[in-house]
Each structure stands twice: as structure tokens, then as C-alpha cells.
A protein has these predicted regions:
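Small/polar/charged residue-enriched interaction surfaces, especially the RNA/DNA-contacting tracks
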Residues: 1-508
Length: 508
């Protein structure tokens, strides 16, 4: 056996710096089941600041790059860009049937990741939000016993300094590595890469405003000295070199559908929440869900609430047709308790801020069904969200915010729902259109206390965009709007949307 040391011939190093800013609450759990909440935040043991591990960043970037190159739900192979940039996996699914001798030979050729990703500690001690979650029984519409949980979240605006370093060896494809790095950096800049848990329900959205990039050619003495003397823990000068002459030739293979729908509140809305974000500690017994955004705490509709409502209405539609719920499970994900089989949801629902609202306290009392009188000591107060009309004086004070917009439907808008479906099938689009219709006509309320008329919406405008990579990244756009109670939609869009619903009927 040879004792000769095998070294890598590194010819270039690329250092990338940026600041990651959270756009929505993010759950970076430490997995401690004995904490004050069911999911505690991962913190630095010395400074008590939030910790973002390098493995979490690498996993998110690797998954994004793989989906960009190969689309969703595709197995990874050692020839993919993700394997070249982030290193080989322990085993590949397409190599399971190979002989042991062949497997051993392939493993000897495995390479580690040329991209070094540092762990990151938040710039400040983070602001923390507490969220409650509960599982709902689809038959009764009530909460299941012993299925409530709570978790800690990093609030929006938390910042993490990022540092990557790409090592380019003489025998590696430099252009391919630079293209792969450019794709993930651009993905972070566009806010298309999420981190942490529950990303499919609106958590973990983030972005990087600007990247600083330094490229060192180690075959040159000056660059070699510059890399050795580079200040790694202080403030660096502005980058003097960019990823030059890098043209992203890789086609985006992701097949995805986006639905953006604007609604106004017809009735008050109440999504119950704890009171840790309410400034008035003498607040009512029940308050609406708030979340921190730039400028203060804002009322929001959580992605989990919207997804749960859509999920149960989709089950109702399919059951009405007396068919199997496989379509719903494939769309919203499932967990089989017996076989332990599970699948993640392909439907991504964003958390949205509720605009143009006011908060009023309403007193209620429980009634004795036997006597018809009030229960003693059963008086309670709730503080739902009410739609508020924008006053003319406010418009004059802030002309930029309320300036005339060609999209007149937005002046009464309270909620803008954003939904993304990965790898959509035509019949699944038809099901989503039926769900959108129920929301549009106030037939599908969201939130709690819907039995007393709360949570009903009225549609104002909807935009549907389908990026279909199966047809060369074809972009298909459809729109629906409302004007004085009349639905506005072109004949072409009407026929196309009706086609999707017909496909659903054929499928079930």
C-alpha cells in the first residue's frame, strides 16, 4: 500500500460574502424535546444568538440547484451539477442494482464538496415569536385531542452574515462550478431558497440584497499573497472582482404554477393566537394572529391556516364525487401511520399580511342550552380583524402609498394569497380553480369562529401563471377580475380554465 500523500492541486479560490435577511418567521429547531416549547430555537452556546448551521445552508442550496437542473421529484445522480458543487452522496438510487465490485470502484471516485460553507450566527440577539399549531379532524372540523404543539420562530428581519469559499482544482470543470455557484447565489438573491422547517407553509423565506465576491488565482504570486492576508473576521474592502464571463446556460427545469389572488374581507376574521406580540397586556381573552414585519407587528394569515382550509375543502369536493382521496394526498402530502409512508406537500402556501384593517373588541357570552339563559362567569372577549376603509385624509397625507394605480381592485384589498404548485397536472389545476372559486364567492371561510359568520372573503382579482418546462419553459398566463359585482375574464381564458376543470372530472 502506497504511503504517498495525495494532495489537491487548487488553482483558484473564490470567496463570497453576503447578509441573509429573513422575510418571514423561520424555525431553526435544535431538536430538544425537553424545552419550554415543543420546538426550541438553535442558539449559540456563548452569545445566545441564533445559529444557522452550515449543513442547513448547504442542504437548502443543494436541493435548489438539483431542482433547477432536473425539476422536482427527480433522483440525483453523480453527474448532476449539485453533486459536482456539493460533493457525492453516500449512495445513489440509480446505482443500487450494480455489482459490489462496481459500487466499490465508484465510491473510490467520490469527491468531497469544493464549496466551503461557514456556520452563521445572527448579527443580534434575535426577536422570537411563539406560534401554536393544532391538527383538525376533517370529519368534525374540530381540533383533535392531544394534537396541539407550539414552536419558537425567528422573526422577520433577523440577519445572518454568510461566507462561502469555492475551491477550484486544476482537473475540475471551472466553468461548470462557476455556473452552479452563480445559480444558487442568484436563487438566494431572488428569494427563491427557503431555510428551516415548514417552508411549504410560508416559513423560512429569505433573501440576500447584494453579494461581494473575491476571486484569487493561486498560480499568481500577488493573488496568493492577497488570499493569505485576506481579512476573514473583520470588515473587508469592497470586492474588486466578480464572477466574470459566467453565462448561465443551464435551463430552469422547474415545472410550477403560481396563483396570486387578491381578496377583501366581507366579515371579521379571527385566527387565534397567543398574546406575546400584543403591546397591550390587558388584551382580550382571544386575539388575532400577529407577526413582526418591518415597521412593527402586523396581523397576518398563516400559510398553515390557508392550507388547512383548502385541504379539507378539497377532500369534500373529491368525496362528493365519491372517489378516492389519492388526488388530495398527492397534492397536500400525507403520513400513513401504519406503513410510516410519508410524502411532502407539493402545494406551497405563503403567509400573507392583512392590510387596511382595524381591530375591535367584541364581548360574547356562553348560553345554557337547557334554560336559554347566560352561563354564570362565561363572559369573554375577542379581538378579530375588521376591514377598514381608507379615509381621504389619509390618502392626502401619504400620496405615495395611496397613489392612483391602474389596478383599481387593490384599493379595497385586504388579503393577497400566493400559492405555488410544483409539477402541476392539469386536473390538479382544475381542483385548485374550484377551491379558488369557493374562496372568491365567500363560500369557504378561513380562520376560527366561522360558525358565527367570520372569515369570509370576496374575490377581487386572480392571476395564474404556469411555467411549463415540459414545453421549453413556456409561460402561460391567465387572469380573472371583478368590477362592480361582474366577473371579467376573456373568452380564451374562460375556455382554458374550463378545460382544467373538465380534466379533473375525467380524472376522478
Amino acid at each position: 500500500m502506497s504511503r504517498e500523500r495525495i494532495s489537491r492541486n487548487i488553482v483558484k479560490r473564490i470567496i463570497v460574502d453576503g447578509v441573509l435577511v429573513l422575510d418571514t418567521p423561520t424555525c431553526l429547531s435544535d431538536g430538544d424535546a425537553l424545552g419550554a416549547t415543543d420546538m426550541m430555537l438553535l442558539r449559540d452556546s456563548i452569545s445566545d444568538k441564533a445559529l444557522l448551521t452550515g449543513s442547513s445552508i448547504a442542504g437548502a442550496l443543494r436541493n435548489y440547484l438539483h431542482e433547477y437542473e432536473c425539476s422536482y421529484e427527480r433522483i440525483e445522480t453523480r453527474s448532476n451539477m449539485s453533486a459536482k458543487l456539493f460533493g457525492d452522496l453516500f449512495a445513489y438510487k440509480d446505482e443500487r442494482n450494480l455489482s459490489e465490485q462496481r459500487k466499490i470502484k465508484l465510491r473510490e471516485e467520490d469527491t468531497q464538496s469544493p464549496l466551503i460553507i461557514n456556520e452563521s450566527i445572527s448579527s443580534k440577539v434575535p426577536r422570537v415569536e411563539l406560534r401554536d399549531g393544532v391538527k383538525i379532524d376533517g370529519k368534525t372540523g374540530t381540533a383533535l385531542d392531544k394534537n396541539k404543539y407550539d414552536l419558537e420562530l425567528l422573526s422577520a428581519g433577523t440577519q445572518f452574515p454568510l461566507r462561502f469559499e469555492l475551491l477550484i482544482e486544476s482537473d475540475k470543470d471551472e466553468v461548470l462550478l462557476k455556473q452552479a455557484l452563480s445559480i444558487v447565489l442568484e436563487g438566494l438573491k431572488k428569494g427563491e431558497i427557503g431555510i428551516g422547517m415548514k417552508k411549504r407553509r410560508g416559513f423560512g423565506k429569505c433573501h440576500v440584497e447584494e453579494w461581494q465576491i473575491w476571486e484569487f488565482d493561486l498560480t499568481k504570486k500577488s493573488d496568493c499573497i492577497a488570499w493569505l492576508t485576506f481579512e476573514r473576521w473583520g470588515t473587508q474592502p469592497h470586492s474588486s472582482k466578480q464572477l466574470q464571463n459566467v453565462k448561465i446556460e443551464q435551463i430552469d427545469r422547474r415545472n410550477r404554477l403560481f396563483i396570486t389572488a387578491n381578496f377583501k374581507l366581507v366579515t371579521p376574521l379571527l385566527i387565534r393566537s397567543n398574546q406575546n406580540l400584543i403591546p397591550n397586556k390587558c388584551s382580550p381573552d382571544t386575539v388575532h394572529l400577529h407577526s413582526y414585519r418591518k415597521g412593527g407587528n402586523k396581523p397576518v394569515v398563516s400559510g398553515a391556516s390557508i392550507a388547512g382550509v383548502l385541504w379539507h375543502r378539497a377532500e369534500r369536493i373529491i368525496k362528493t364525487l365519491d372517489k378516492d382521496l389519492k388526488i388530495v394526498n398527492e397534492l397536500f402530502g400525507f403520513v400513513d401511520e401504519e406503513t410510516k409512508e410519508a410524502k411532502a406537500s407539493r402545494l406551497l402556501v405563503d403567509e400573507t399580511i392583512i392590510e387596511n384593517t382595524s381591530e375591535l373588541v367584541q364581548s360574547r357570552i356562553a348560553i345554557d342550552r337547557f334554560t336559554g339563559g347566560a352561563y354564570h362567569g362565561a363572559l369573554f372577549q375577542e379581538q378579530p380583524i375588521y376591514p377598514a376603509q381608507v379615509k381621504e385624509d389619509d390618502k392626502k397625507k401619504d400620496k405615495n402609498k395611496y397613489k392612483k394605480n391602474p389596478d383599481e381592485s387593490r384599493k379595497d384589498m385586504n388579503i393577497s394569497l400566493q400559492i405555488e404548485l410544483q409539477n402541476p397536472k392539469e386536473y390538479e389545476i382544475g381542483l385548485l380553480l374550484l377551491l379558488l372559486k369557493d374562496l372568491w364567492v365567500s363560500d369557504l371561510p378561513i380562520g376560527g369562529t366561522t360558525s358565527i359568520g367570520r372569515g369570509r372573503l370576496q374575490g377581487l382579482e386572480a392571476r395564474i401563471v404556469w411555467y411549463n418546462s415540459n414545453y421549453g419553459s413556456l409561460e402561460e398566463k391567465r387572469s380573472i377580475s371583478e368590477n362592480k359585482g361582474k366577473l371579467i375574464i376573456s373568452d380564451q381564458d374562460k375556455q382554458r380554465l374550463e378545460y382544467f376543470v373538465e380534466k379533473l372530472v375525467e380524472q376522478v
